[in-house]
């Protein structure tokens, strides 16, 4: 097999006739500025061709079902393996998706429980089982020889009636005896039963003695009894005393509980699926949650008194006085005060206020003429009131208002397990499938590893357990051991979702495959990075080729081969600047990546941190959503704050689910319900909140930077204001390519026409009428400063910034797009061709161009996703500009370059999942670096340098920590001849990344030296 992957003449997107030779069975990292062409080469050329060739090998019939792959614009590629891609797609937001279903572990667990699970009765908890007639006979013949018994067929169990016809029918069939309510009777003289009482009737099929010669007769009798009763037989051992539990033995062909008279259908794997009607809880249809009124949202702040409006739905609007009088009447009736905090009220009073009061209360009030009036009325209670008004609401606005007091709570029927009671009563080693799914992945792996099974079950479960354990092991390896299998996919952070997909793909254990990965380190803390790198290295050692598009320093240093694409982005990129080893990259003066890695260029440390005003802060009190452990956290206003911590420590929950959602609700009137917390102080000091998250922008070909940021509306208005447009009577709508009027109708404003080729890829050709301009001839005759609307859409943003300089509404948008580093992107460039990093910056620009008031809070979730060192530098300049105007920027981030430039750091942890949810450290980066318990602090110490840490932290412990680092550095100095003294600190930090260390020590050293000097 070829030992190289050869690419010749790649011209996809902005690639400029790129030719490359890559080693196979290696870890290859593609790096370069955002938008330089890394993804175009890795995904749109190499992966697309590998995938297309595999699909081409199938029959034309199969191909038409598979979605066609476009042939990339490349001359040829040699040495290509079947390709698997793991890209930056957002996770499924489907409420039915869980970690277990995405990773397919749950599918194997369903199979395991269906085949070796022990069913129990959901009512009484006794084991239930089924037996064939032969198995029943074999069990009976194992009993002591000579035991006498009678074979009974239960026909009626605890049912009302006289059953005259049944007795007559049995007699005609030749049966002579029956047992009615425990008494044996002759059918020739049947008893007269009371119609209104419940009766049990069993017909005596045969009377036998245990001996081998009776085997055939016993089998016939058992089969007859099973046939009569529909699958049940009772054996009554007459020699045993009446009260002996062994006297009667009941056997069933089906799953049946004789004690509760419940019979159950066969257990199949689908019975354990909450996405199937056979297994889903009938009340919540397998979702596991229901919308219920939450008392915490009714009384958000228990420190307020009733007079101050503690009961939120009753403290607003024109009904405020009415409810005030009603509460006063209840206070008189129950004898409590309304001027003390709600938390201090007696339990009886709080219960009555929330859930209602049985007896009527007397309300007294003065009407507008000053006369006192009184009436008696029922006191409904705040929770029933919200429930009733929500169900009676006729308008969406009214319904949404009351939904603001409701929260998703676990379904009361299934307790949030999503499954039917019978399914939950099936156990393996005493645990139900719901209990196994609720364990953390590491506990689940231990539980399945310690299963003790009998020989039969072992043989059945062997293969299933092997598959499950493989998948679980891999999830543990990529640092997701704290997640549980029943965790909803929608609640995962970006990094968790990405690594779950990685685990799913790599768990298959294929060899000789080309894996193309897009930034697998997103959302991963430096502490966990080495585990991911070890996984990638192990995957390579199995005999696979890995192409990783990555900006992470550690990953770049471990790579066998680096391809740096650039030198700039967009039209200024698309060339291979470097293809070779890390060492050669560091010496390459043209490569931006090389300049940063070697330390010749660095993101500087700020000389001083912006001062904080203790009176101006946002403080979240009592945060306890997800894994947060009732914490109070402060965010100083007017500074740049970074929220850090290992993956799954509760950063997104605190910032996105609680702080941002609360501010959006208070300031923007949003309807979303914030996560559980007591209150937020300081929200009166800000007047606007803006959020930029990781979700992609609209991925339709009609969406582009101009339409997404809203600047296109201003451009269309400007064209409609030109003399020519006014003469022709054109309105702004004439200049839209999405509506009839000004667009070319041949291609409906797309500029291209899709030609369907059935089982070959669809071909897109430029429209022969407008030649790709999207507009009709008349519209294109309108010019502004000599350019038509199509010319403007085709302009790079940096050119458009100068072109529209005189129009403030447009130039503001253009300047922001240019500032975030998108000057090379064309205004009308389709959103589908933007890289992940570019799409996020378009989103950022559309938020940043809004006029800042100086009292705005910007919340950004991992803004460095997909960004190169150079791009991060530009981003920090933009964010710094916002803070200098008095605004507040809060970022959730793992990137040390961003954290070291922050004014304030809130470090969450100490671990992920149940081991997190606390604030480990808060303060300036220097102070956090001095906290031994902080994982982030440990890595910050190496970036900042020991001298800065000791200066900033007034506590003794940080000084001690700093001394230790300095001592280690000194010790290393003697051993390292080629590198300067401070270099060794980086080597100490990277020691954790076991595989990384050997290749990385020297380059790492250089970088740190320069950074600390800067």
Swiss-Prot record:
It is found in: Cytoplasm. A zinc finger (C4-type) spans 744-770. PROSITE patterns: ABC_TRANSPORTER_1, ABC_TRANSPORTER_2. Pfam families: ABC_tran, UvrA_DNA-bind, UvrA_inter. One of its GO terms (molecular function) is ATP hydrolysis activity. ATP binds at residues 32-39, 645-652. Residues 996-1014 have a biased composition (Basic residues). Coiled coil: none annotated. GO terms for cellular component: cytoplasm; excinuclease repair complex. Residues 314-592, 612-941 form the ABC transporter domain. This is UvrABC system protein A. It comes from Streptomyces coelicolor (strain ATCC BAA-471 / A3(2) / M145).
């Amino acid at each position: 097999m070829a030992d190289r992957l050869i690419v010749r003449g790649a011209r996809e997107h902005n690639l400029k006739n790129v030719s490359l030779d890559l080693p196979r069975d290696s870890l290859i990292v593609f790096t370069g500025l955002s938008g330089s062409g890394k993804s175009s080469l890795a995904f749109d050329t190499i992966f697309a061709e590998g995938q297309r060739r595999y699909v081409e090998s199938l029959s034309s019939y199969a191909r038409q079902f598979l979605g066609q792959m476009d042939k990339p614009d490349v001359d040829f590629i040699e040495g290509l393996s079947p390709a698997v891609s793991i890209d930056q797609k957002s996770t499924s937001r489907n409420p039915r998706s869980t970690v277990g279903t995405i990773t397919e572990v749950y599918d194997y667990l369903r199979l395991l429980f269906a085949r070796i699970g022990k069913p129990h009765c959901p009512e009484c908890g006794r084991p239930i089982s089924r037996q064939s007639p032969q198995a029943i006979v074999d069990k009976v013949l194992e009993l002591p020889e000579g035991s006498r018994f009678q074979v009974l067929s239960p026909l009626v169990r605890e049912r009302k009636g006289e059953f005259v016809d049944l007795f007559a029918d049995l007699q005609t069939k030749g049966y002579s005896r029956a047992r009615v309510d425990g008494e044996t009777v002759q059918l020739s003289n049947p008893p007269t039963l009371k119609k209104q009482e419940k009766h049990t009737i069993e017909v005596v099929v045969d009377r036998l003695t245990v001996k081998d010669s009776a085997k055939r007769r016993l089998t016939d009798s058992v089969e007859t009894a099973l046939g009569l009763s529909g699958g049940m037989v009772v054996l009554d051992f007459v020699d045993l005393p009446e009260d002996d539990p062994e006297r009667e033995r009941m056997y069933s062909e089906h799953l049946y509980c004789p004690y509760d008279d419940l019979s159950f259908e066969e257990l199949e794997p689908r019975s354990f699926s909450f996405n199937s009607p056979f297994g889903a809880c009938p009340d919540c249809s397998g979702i596991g949650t229901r919308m219920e009124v939450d008392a915490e949202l009714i009384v958000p702040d228990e420190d307020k008194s009733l007079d101050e409006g503690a009961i939120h739905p009753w403290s607003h609007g024109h009904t405020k006085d009415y409810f005030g009088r009603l509460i006063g009447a209840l206070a008189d009736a129950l004898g409590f005060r309304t001027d003390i905090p709600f938390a201090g009220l007696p339990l009886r009073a709080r219960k009555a206020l929330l859930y209602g009061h049985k007896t009527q209360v007397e309300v007294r009030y003065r009407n507008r003429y000053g006369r006192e009036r009184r009436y008696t009325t029922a006191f409904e209670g705040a929770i029933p009131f919200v429930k009733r008004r929500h169900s009676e609401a006729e308008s969406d606005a009214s319904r949404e208002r009351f939904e603001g007091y409701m929260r998703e709570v676990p379904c009361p029927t299934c307790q949030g397990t999503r499954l039917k009671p019978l399914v939950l009563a099936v156990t393996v080693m005493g645990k139900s499938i719901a209990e196994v799914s609720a364990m953390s992945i590491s506990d689940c792996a231990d539980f399945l590893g310690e299963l003790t099974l009998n020989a039969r079950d072992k043989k059945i479960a062997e293969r299933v357990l092997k598959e499950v354990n493989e998948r679980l092991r891999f999830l543990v390896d990529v640092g997701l051991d704290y997640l549980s299998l029943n965790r909803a996919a929608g609640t995962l952070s970006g990094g968790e979702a990405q690594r779950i997909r990685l685990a799913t793909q790599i768990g298959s254990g294929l060899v000789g495959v080309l894996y193309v990965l897009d930034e697998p380190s997103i959302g991963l803390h430096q502490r966990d990075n080495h585990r991911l790198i070890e996984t990638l290295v192990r995957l390579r050692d199995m005999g696979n080729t890995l192409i990783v598009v990555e900006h992470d320093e550690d990953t770049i240093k471990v790579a066998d081969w680096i391809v740096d694409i650039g030198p700039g982005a967009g039209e200024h990129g698309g060339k291979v600047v470097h293809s070779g080893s890390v060492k050669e990259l560091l010496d390459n003066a043209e490569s931006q990546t090389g300049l940063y890695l070697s330390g010749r260029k660095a993101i500087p440390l700020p000389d001083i941190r912006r001062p904080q005003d203790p009176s101006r802060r946002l403080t979240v009190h009592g945060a306890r959503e997800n894994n947060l452990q009732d914490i109070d956290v402060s965010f100083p206003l007017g500074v740049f704050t970074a929220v850090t911590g290992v993956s799954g420590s509760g950063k997104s929950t605190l910032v996105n689910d609680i702080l941002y959602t609360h501010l959006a609700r208070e300031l923007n009137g949003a309807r979303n319900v914030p996560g559980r917390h007591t209150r937020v102080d300081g929200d009166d000091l800000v007047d606007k909140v803006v959020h930029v998250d990781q979700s992609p922008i609209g991925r339709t070909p009609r969406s582009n930077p101009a339409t997404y940021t809203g600047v296109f509306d201003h451009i269309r208005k400007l064209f409609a204001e030109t003399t020519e447009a006014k003469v022709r009577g054109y309105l702004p709508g004439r200049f839209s390519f999405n509506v009839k009027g000004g667009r070319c109708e041949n291609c409906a404003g797309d500029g291209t026409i899709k030609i369907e080729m059935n089982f070959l890829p669809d071909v897109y050709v430029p429209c022969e009428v407008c030649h790709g301009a999207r507009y009709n001839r008349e519209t294109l005759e309108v010019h502004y400063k000599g350019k038509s609307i199509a010319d403007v859409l085709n302009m790079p943003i940096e050119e458009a910034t100068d072109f529209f300089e005189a129009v403030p509404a447009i130039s503001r948008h253009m300047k922001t797009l240019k500032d975030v580093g998108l000057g090379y992107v064309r205004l009308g460039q389709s959103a589908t061709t933007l890289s992940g990093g570019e799409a996020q910056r378009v989103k950022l620009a559309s938020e940043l161009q809004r006029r800042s008031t100086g009292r705005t809070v910007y919340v950004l979730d991992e803004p460095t996703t997909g960004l190169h060192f150079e791009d991060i530098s530009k981003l920090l300049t933009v964010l710094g500009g916002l803070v200098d105007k008095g605004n507040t920027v809060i970022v959730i981030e793992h990137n040390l370059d961003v954290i070291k430039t922050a004014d304030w750091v809130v470090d969450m942890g100490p671990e992920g999942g149940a081991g997190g949810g606390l604030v480990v450290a808060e303060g300036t980066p220097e102070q956090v670096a001095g906290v031994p318990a902080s994982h982030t602090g440990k890595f910050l110490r190496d970036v900042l340098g020991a001298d800065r840490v000791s200066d900033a932290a007034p506590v003794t412990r940080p000084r001690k920590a700093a001394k230790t680092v300095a001592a280690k550095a000194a010790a290393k100095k003697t051993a390292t001849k080629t590198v300067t003294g401070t270099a060794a600190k980086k080597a100490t930090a990277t020691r954790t990344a076991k595989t990384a260390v050997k290749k990385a020590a020297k380059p790492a050293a250089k970088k740190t030296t320069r950074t600390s000097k800067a």
